[in-house]
Amino acid sequence: MQEITTNDIKELLARIVRWTNAMEAHKQDGHAFNVFHLCSVDHYENAHSRIIAEFLNPRASHGMGSVFLRDFLMRPNVLEHIKRKGFQIEDGLGSLDSAIVETEEPFHEGRCDITIHWRGWCIVIENKIYAADQPEQLMRYNQAVEKTGERPILFYLTLDGHSASTESSGDVDYCRISYREDIAEWIAECANAVQELPHIRETLNQYHNLIEELSNNQKVLKMNSEIVKEMTSSHYHPIGA
């Protein structure tokens, strides 16, 4: 059994100090202010689904047509998955203008968080921030879409991009995407595309900051867990014990 040394304690404390300093700097430079946070949408999956769907929707109030939708579909792992399914994006933005984006769309086997209908395809985005998987959830969505005559393409969205439970997915082919990388980077790309439209740009930037905050909160929880695990590990015991 290995003893906890003074250096181990110093390293642990240094990690905590670095994180605390980073959080204080975040507050002081104004990034802690977030209208989405003030509206208490942080942890509500339905609210995030509506926000994401609004940006994806070619007919939404942002007035950008299918620009944001195309940018999302062109994300590397998203594009790889839809191409593998046979989904082809035609040249030019206009080809996606007819896409229909919905939230909480009712199917016989439940409600899908986000759906994108386009030319016989139905892209389903199952949004999981904190809620647990339901039994056979992805399998049921896949079957429900097939029953409509459309071809399903499934995405499983979480903060960190982890896999769905086997009880939910079974052998259904789906693609993992994350808020931390896929959504955050996509939102940043959308903000860059509307530099001349400050009201839309700042809304996107605010949402991007919220995603970073949620991702950082998850990192804090993971770090706390690692610290507790490290301090209670059987590999260490207090000096002199």
For the regions a language model picked out, list residue spans one by one.
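Charged, terminal alpha-helix-loop-beta segments
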Residues: 1-241
